[in-house]
Curated annotation (Swiss-Prot):
Keywords: Capsule biogenesis/degradation, Cell membrane, Exopolysaccharide synthesis, Membrane, Transferase, Transmembrane, Transmembrane helix, Virulence. PANTHER family: COLANIC BIOSYNTHESIS UDP-GLUCOSE LIPID CARRIER TRANSFERASE, SLL5057 PROTEIN. This is Galactosyl transferase CpsE. Changing T262M: In strain: SG96/585 / Serotype III. Its EC number is 2.7.8.-. Galactosyl transferase is essential for the assembly of the group B streptococci (GBS) type III capsular polysaccharide. May be involved in the formation of either or both galactosidic bonds by catalyzing the addition of galactose to an oligosaccharide precursor or to a lipid intermediate. Type III capsular polysaccharide consists of a linear backbone with short side chains ending in residues of N-acetylneuraminic acid or sialic acid. One of its GO terms (cellular component) is plasma membrane. GO terms for molecular function: phosphotransferase activity, for other substituted phosphate groups. It is found in: Cell membrane. Its main location: membrane. It comes from the Bacteria. Changing V370A: In strain: COH1 / Serotype III. The chain crosses the membrane at residues 5-22, 27-46, 59-78, 88-107, 258-280.
């Protein structure tokens, strides 16, 4: 997808600057058609992430030679059908080759850099037994952050040394319940296969996987069935089989972040313009214009969440008295004609203007344009393992819930189902679709209150 943009840019720039009487639609369609043919004939997509920079250079040359050969053949057959000159064609080939190589090299570098950053921030729980733990070597060159350990054949009092190293000790009988409350991204199960039955490892895998937490198991567990997907990878120097409900295309994850940054910049520009007129109206009651609150993000991370204030300053205190009137079933609070909402608040909630400051959260990386809605800390503390699954993806400003009736949904379990559906079926295309549908919902004011 990204390579197509480069090809289109190179072709349109070259043809516009060099070719007289440029027939844009016809010639550009021809260029893109050849690109797709050459892309697959040259195996340009194969082993993309494992190719080194020299191999990438060779692949771009191979792609370019294929492009020249096929284009020349078509030019000969349809020589009177195109306005492209030899100068513009070879200028395009040179520019396109350079830009493709630079783009692909950048994607590889960005992936390597972002993976290192992700690894440093990855919270890992270790599940093992005493014998396997004694054989493990923790190397500084691996940046995964162990935060807790569950030793299946030891009592808590036997784990003094691990406590001394600031590792949280989890009792094997409370493993699932404690992981539900912890900020944890991955679990590493390192235990001999002959003990899997004794300690019900398959049940542990399924329980943790159901939370949306990635599970890494020693590669000997390859024969085990699981409810999601699995891959063989390396983890801390070990060969492991990694279980996850779904593995996403890395190119789509990069595209999602680029989309977030672009959308956040545009959104913040709009937010700044709106704030000039809106802030004085909100502050008429003497309170701040911006409401901020701790919310829970991906896998339990706490971040500061921002909105234009649409409620009274003492809204959180009044909420305690209104809980008996909650119209939501489950771990969310919703009340039609909420008495805490100010006069200007009704307008900005109806038009969704109150959400604009969240573009700052998106730019920071705490949130995404599309995702699940971030719960409050008190709501999160009551989650079970199934409900925590909705936090395995970065929270968003909009999502399936917002375009599926928004305030018409009153059952929290239905929201969880929509969130899990989004996570299971996610691709960059689903995000784009949800953004477009959200614009429609906001412009029509459908379901917003």
């Amino acid at each position: 997808m990204i390579q197509t943009v480069v090809v289109y840019f190179s072709a349109s720039l070259t043809l516009t600057l060099i070719t007289p009487n440029f027939k844009s639609n016809k010639d550009l369609l021809f260029v893109l058609l050849i690109h797709y043919i050459v892309f697959y004939l040259s195996d340009f997509y194969r082993d993309f992430w494992s190719r080194g920079y020299l191999e990438e250079f060779k692949m771009v040359l191979k792609y370019s030679f294929y492009y020249i050969f096929i284009s020349s053949s078509l030019f000969f057959i349809f020589k009177n059908s195109f306005t492209t000159t030899r100068l513009s064609f070879f200028t395009f080939i040179a520019m396109n080759s350079i830009l493709l190589y630079l783009l692909n090299s950048f994607l590889k570098y960005y992936r390597k850099y972002s993976y290192a950053k992700f690894s440093r921030d990855t919270k890992v729980v270790l599940i093992t037994n005493k014998d396997s733990l004694s054989k493990m070597t923790f190397r500084n060159k691996y940046d995964h952050n162990y935060i807790a350990v569950c030793i299946l054949d030891s009592s808590e009092k036997d784990c003094y040394d691990l406590k001394h190293n600031s590792l949280r000790i989890i009792n094997k009988d409370a493993l699932t319940s404690e992981l539900t409350c912890l900020t944890v991204d991955q679990a590493f199960i390192n235990i001999p296969i002959e003990l899997f039955g004794k300690y019900q490892i398959q049940d542990i895998i399924n329980d943790i996987e159901a939370m949306g937490v990635i599970v890494n198991v020693n590669v000997e567990a390859l024969s085990f069935d699981n409810i999601g997907e699995k891959r063989i990878q390396t983890f801390e120097g070990y060969s492991v089989i990694t279980y996850s409900m779904k593995f996403y295309k890395y190119s789509h994850l990069i595209a999602k972040r680029f989309l977030d940054i672009t959308g956040a910049i545009i959104g913040l520009l709009i937010c700044g313009i709106v704030a000039i007129f809106l802030v004085p109206q909100i502050r008429k009651d003497g309170g701040p214009a911006i409401f901020s609150q701790n919310r829970v993000g991906r896998n339990g991370r706490i971040f500061r969440f921002y909105k234009f204030r649409s409620m009274r300053v003492d809204a959180e205190q009044i909420k305690k008295d209104l809980l008996v009137h909650n119209q939501m079933t489950g771990l969310m609070f919703k009340l039609e004609d909420d008495p805490r909402i100010t006069k200007i608040g009704k307008f900005i909630r109806k038009t969704s203007i109150d959400e604009l400051p969240q573009f700052y959260n998106v730019l920071k990386g705490d949130m995404s344009l599309v995702g699940t809605r971030p719960p409050t800390v008190d709501e999160y503390e009551k989650y079970n393992s199934t409900q925590k699954r909705r936090l395995s993806f970065k929270p968003g400003i909009t999502g399936l819930w917002q375009i599926s009736g928004r305030n018409n949904i009153t059952d929290f379990d239905e929201i969880v189902k929509l969130d899990v559906q989004y996570i299971n079926e996610w691709s960059i295309w689903s995000d784009i679709k949800i953004i477009l549908l959200t614009l429609k919902v906001v412009l029509l004011g459908t379901g917003a209150k």
